[in-house]
Curated annotation (Swiss-Prot):
This is Phosphoribosyl-AMP cyclohydrolase. The keyword RNA-binding does not apply. It is found in: Cytoplasm. Homodimer. It catalyses: 1-(5-phospho-beta-D-ribosyl)-5'-AMP + H2O = 1-(5-phospho-beta-D-ribosyl)-5-[(5-phospho-beta-D-ribosylamino)methylideneamino]imidazole-4-carboxamide. One of its GO terms (molecular function) is zinc ion binding. Signal peptide: none annotated. It comes from Acidiphilium cryptum (strain JF-5). Pathway: Amino-acid biosynthesis; L-histidine biosynthesis; L-histidine from 5-phospho-alpha-D-ribose 1-diphosphate: step 3/9. Its cofactor is Mg(2+); Zn(2+). One of its GO terms (biological process) is L-histidine biosynthetic process.
Length: 116
């Protein structure tokens, strides 16, 4: 049976929906990635977050090679049904660069500034 969130979600023309990962206990925004119906279903059934990699064209199980997994605490669908919020327990850095989160470049009037 298809989970109701998959039925309610408004996927784009490629069958994807943006998902924002947020540390459940601090509220820190960690990253944004894409999910499809299969990755949503897997995340809900296993409790480990799974995304869809657009560059590789396949499921991307977060932390599969790095060990920096995300345990799904809660999943929320926004009011328009076109974005997911994943409340997660992050193990290690969330960003592939090794940064704790993917939002470490502040936009200023003069350009970009790296922040911790």
């Amino acid at each position: 049976m298809t989970h109701p969130v998959i039925t309610a979600a408004r996927f784009n023309e490629a069958g994807l929906i943006p998902a924002i990962a947020q540390q459940h206990d601090t509220g820190e925004v960690l990253m944004m990635a894409w999910m499809n119906a299969e990755s949503i279903a897997e995340s809900l059934s296993t409790g480990q977050v799974c995304y869809f990699s657009r560059s590789r064209g396949k499921l991307w199980r977060k932390g599969e090679s790095s060990g920096h997994v995300q345990r799904l605490v809660e999943m929320r669908l926004d009011c328009d049904g076109d974005t997911l919020l994943l409340l997660v327990e992050q193990t290690g850095p969330a960003c592939h660069t090794g940064a704790h989160n993917c939002f470490f470049r502040r936009v200023t009037k003069d350009g970009l500034e790296e922040i911790a």
